[in-house]
Regions:
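Conserved non-catalytic scaffold segment of RNase H-like nuclease domains
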Residues: 1-97
Length: 100
């Protein structure tokens, strides 16, 4: 079974926060998805911005998660998904429910 590796950056650590960046790479380190994401509801995230450096200006023209949802599903379908900080990151990715 192929393995992909996933990491996110978010607007914060609460359940109502959103992704601002998603990276999925393969075993060779090749990026399969590497994109900024424009949040639907959050317009600023100063605390998280201090951690990851991604500002609202950086994501103003980025796709929303809804727009890349099918791409995420295609990349993870049938693959083992290794997630950095899985308990946290997976709550931002309902697309993973269909992965196996």
């Amino acid at each position: 079974m192929e393995t992909v590796y996933l990491d996110t950056e978010t607007t914060g650590v609460s359940d109502d926060d959103e992704m601002v960046e998603l990276t999925i790479i393969d075993d060779d380190g090749k990026p399969l998805i590497n994109t900024l994401i424009k949040p639907k509801y959050h317009t600023s995230w100063p605390g998280a911005q201090r951690v990851h450096g991604i500002s609202p200006i950086d994501v103003r023209h980025a796709p929303t998660q809804d727009r890349i949802s099918n791409d995420i599903r295609k990349v993870v379908k049938g693959k083992r998904v290794v997630i950095y900080n899985a308990p946290f990151d997976s709550k931002f990715l309902p697309e993973l429910e269909d992965a196996a």
